[in-house]
Amino acid sequence: MTEVLWISWGIRLFKSLTLEPAIVLHTRSYKETSLIVESFTRNYGRVSFVAKGAKRPKSKIGVIKTPSCLFLISCRGKGDLKTLTHCEINTYFDPSSENFNSLVYLNELLIKLLEKEDPHPEIFDHYLKVCNFLKHLGKKDLGTHLRFFELNLLKEIGYGLDLKFEANSNNEIKEQNRYAFDPIIGFQLLKDSSDKKNCYKGKDIINFSKGDLTNPDALLASKQIMREAIDFHLGNKSIKIREY
C-alpha cells in the first residue's frame, strides 16, 4: 500500500511505502547512529531514506545493514529523503566471494544510470534473476547474464542497441562483415578494418542479438560493445568497481 501526493504538473511524490520490495544499492553513515540508504524499489524506482538509529545494536531496523538481500521496506516522508519505519529480509542472495564484485557493479550501474523515483519493474526483476545466479555460476556464465542485464537496462531507459541492422540503413548485419560501433547511431559497416582497434565481426554481433554467447569471441565482443555503450551514457561518471 502506498500513499501518493500529486502536484499540478503531474509529478508523483511518495508520502509512504508499505512493505515494498527493495534492494540496497549503497549506504553511508549519518550522524552517530543512523544511515542514509540508496535503495531500488520494484514499483517506485530509486528511493533514498534515512534509517534512524540503524547502527544501534538493538535497532529494529538494523537489519537494513545486511548485505546482498531483497528487503521489504516501509517508509514515510514528503521530500526526496524518506524515513525508514520498517524493514525485513525477504531473500538472501549469498553471492560467492568470486562474484561479489559483480553485485557491486550492478548496484553502481543502477545508481548512475537510473533517475530517482522513476519505476522500472522489469529492470528490478531482471536484477533479482541475475542475483540468483551469483552464488554458483562461474565467471563465463555469469558474464553472459551481466551482458544481457546491461543490454536490457539500456533498452529500458531509452538507449537500446540495434544488433540486427547497420547504422542508418535497412541492411541487415552480415556474418562475414566487420563493423565499427558508435553508441549513438549503432554499427557502421567497415570497408577496411585494418586501422580500427574496436571493430566487431558481424557473426559475433548476430550471436549477441540471438542471445547466444557460448562462443568466447562473441562473449568478449559483447563485453566490449556494452562497455562502450555504457561509458558513453555515463558521461563524466565512472564505475568505481572497475578500478579494483
Language-model-detected regions and their locations in the chain:
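Non-catalytic alpha-helical scaffolds and adjoining flexible linkers that form interface surfaces
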Residues: 3-35, 40-244
